[in-house]
Amino acid sequence: EIGSCDWSSDVCSSDLGHKYQIDEIKKHSDAVIAVMSGSFVQRGDVAITDKWSRAKTALSSGVDLVIELPVCYALNAAPNFATGGINILNALGVVNNICFGSESGSIDELMSAAELLENENSEISEKIKKYVMGGMSYPNALTKAYSALIPSDILSEPNNILATEYIRALIRSDSKIKPMTVKRHKAGYHDRNLYQNIASATKLREMNRNNENINDFIPYKLEDINCDIPYDISNLDSAIISKLRLMTAEDLQNISEVTEGIENRILSSANMSYSFETLVENVKNKRYTTSKIRRMIISALIGFTKDIYSPMPQYIRILGINKVGMTILKQAKGICKVPIITKTADFKEQSPQFNLDVRATNIAMLCNPIPTHRIGNADLKKSPIIMK
């Protein structure tokens, strides 16, 4: 059997929490595929280092095949993020199980919540609409509307939210892939505390920026991976402000996730902000989560317009592979529903999703801590990481 895991974390992409998850998957599966965010991550930040270094860490942690989650899914709200990941695995045609981390740890509880959300009745819909109109963010409105039916932590904890969306995407696509979950091992998604040898992505980024040793919290040594770390989004401060000051409200309306007049607030805030972080603070209000505001701004910078997103991926891109992964890939090539990219030079199709990935990587490279390494077109030059 082939199992898959979501790989949305960005800490050189693997912490001991993920190693624990992989070890659990391997108890039930012969091989592990990871679908990993590329240059930017869902909370609206640049990934901590380049995607090839992170693919290498995934392989070092026990993954057999690393696939990139295109940025049109990675830099998106939970439903679209999950849809992209599930449809990649559906298209691949060789996956039997998907495993994701959750605060709940109960697949029955998550499936029950997902089925309720997927079959939303008009009464619940009206409640959500009313709460949002009252200035509540959509996640908070959802939690309140379902308070009598679904435990509040299912709709408020980030990994639980993604877990229910993965299950909903499986339901919508009539997928044969079976969901499994592994309880988040102590450290939550944004937890800033340390628990023995487990730390969250947020905590590890913070430690890295403070030059603290994180080797005890990851299943490899950073010097063995030889990556430039950490990438810092503040390198893009001027680029972000410049880009927004050159845009019109009409331009911004076409950008992913921009709705309800937020474009006017973003543009006016860009005129009185001097950095990405001050811009986010100036745009912030009760209706939008900070992550969503960050995603909208980055989407504007990389030219991620609404028309680029589609539920079905236009390709599957391999970032890393080992011997077991090669066997999986050989099996998939005969049945996969979309092109599989191993060498980008061989990919001749016109793909707005792929072009967006190239732009995203070009921009993300500017966040490299070493100025001479901020090269462009890495997507067109680099090959997958092969671990023998």
Specify the residue positions occupied by each region the protein language model found.
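Single conserved hydrophobic/aromatic residue that forms the stacking wall/gate
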Residues: 1-7, 11
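A short beta-strand-loop structural module common to alpha/beta enzyme folds
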Residues: 31-41
